[in-house]
């Protein structure tokens, strides 16, 4: 790889999520389907409480928490499926996403062509300087 930074590295990208850390994507998904993280937290809470009840020796409480854990897992899976069905049924949203992807691809292609043209100009300038240098050396 080249030590020189690419012109793509200047932050002109249309897709800001491309450079964002993973937790922004997680937050975005949580906003889209808020029941899934709540179900995960409830499942973890029930699991922790069941482990605590087992440690104390309260078998009845542990069994209730195991049952609650299974119920919360089921509700979480149902929320996942429901969210997938809800977001999967919107063809307009899919069409908009495809259009955004096409626009992003065209933008990236344009940036790549500009980058290639810029590099080509740099190579031509280097060749001109090298030819001028050689000509100066020959004159000496």
From Swiss-Prot:
Disulfide bonds: none annotated. Pfam families: HIG_1_N (PF04588). GO terms for biological process: mitochondrial cytochrome c oxidase assembly; mitochondrial respirasome assembly; regulation of proton transport. GO terms for cellular component: mitochondrial inner membrane; mitochondrion; respiratory chain complex. InterPro entries: Hypoxia_induced_domain (IPR007667), RCF1 (IPR050355). It is found in: Mitochondrion membrane. Keywords: Membrane, Mitochondrion, Transmembrane, Transmembrane helix. Belongs to the RCF1 family. PANTHER family: HIG1 DOMAIN FAMILY MEMBER 1A (PTHR12297:SF3), HYPOXIA-INDUCBILE GENE 1 HIG1 -RELATED (PTHR12297). This is Respiratory supercomplex factor 1, mitochondrial. The lineage of its organism: Eukaryota, Fungi, Dikarya, Ascomycota, Saccharomycotina. The gene is RCF1.
